[in-house]
Amino acid sequence: MSDKPVHVVIVAAGSGSRFGSDIPKQFVPLCGRPVVFYPIEAFRTAMPDAEITLVISPSMEELWRDLCAKHGFTSPRIVYGGATRWESVRNALGAYPGHDTVYIHDGARPLVTPDLIKRLGAALSDGRADGALPTVALTDSIRLLHDGKPSTAVDRSRYKAIQTPQVFDGHKLEQAYRLPYSPAFTDDASVMEAAGHDNIILVEGDSRNIKITHGGDIALAAYHIDNAAK
């Protein structure tokens, strides 16, 4: 075991093309402050000693520094992202290796709570699991698509939607990210599973922990923030 604190990687290097803004969604205002400020603060509250790495596009660094100066916000250390989320996470792990525990979180999920962060860490604390993921139940009906054939209904109770943060044994995660990229890597857990580290615990997530994807999501996130403040 190392004596390094927990490593938190917040991935905020995406372009957010579906959001329809001049700047990536993780930097747009949410209740007057950039979206990505919120998860950084949640991790600082939950784990004051954690080392936080923010992964951003090089083209956004000037904007980020300006936003921090404007709001009096202390920036975590910065790593430049790659062309894909997988590359961005790999860059962060490569820049700051050797941690026993690593959290990976989407910078566009502003409503993560310290409680969820702590519950995920507790699920991993006994050292037996490779990782832990927050999940929420599906509420819509879902159908399975077949090439050239009609779609079929499936039992949604057998499926879960996966959120972030995802937390892992840091040494196993670093090993997994040495694998060559595969289109099957839909999240960090899928990278771990490809490396044979498949003892992944599912933890009850939070339906409010939405990912900002479209313009209307900002209004929904603001609603949740306003309600939490009452």
Language model features by range: what are they?
Residues S2, K160-K230:
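Conserved alpha/beta core of the MobA/IspD/sugar-nucleotide pyrophosphorylase nucleotidyltransferase superfamily
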Residues S2-E62:
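N-terminal glycine-rich phosphate-binding loop and ensuing alpha1 helix
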Residues I10, V36, A92, H105-D106, ...:
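Residue-level signal for inorganic ion chemistry
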Residues F19, W64-C68, L120, I142, ...:
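Hydrophobic packing residues within well-ordered alpha-helices of enzyme cores
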Residues T45-P48, A69-S75, G127-R128:
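Short helix-capping segments at alpha-helix termini
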Residues D49-T53, S75-P76, D130-G131, R178, ...:
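Short active-site oxyanion
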Residues S75-R77, A83-K149, Q163-T164:
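Conserved beta-loop-beta/alpha segment of the NTase-like Rossmann-fold superfamily
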Residues T152-I162:
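A recurrent flexible, glycine/aromatic-enriched loop bordering the glycosyltransferase active site
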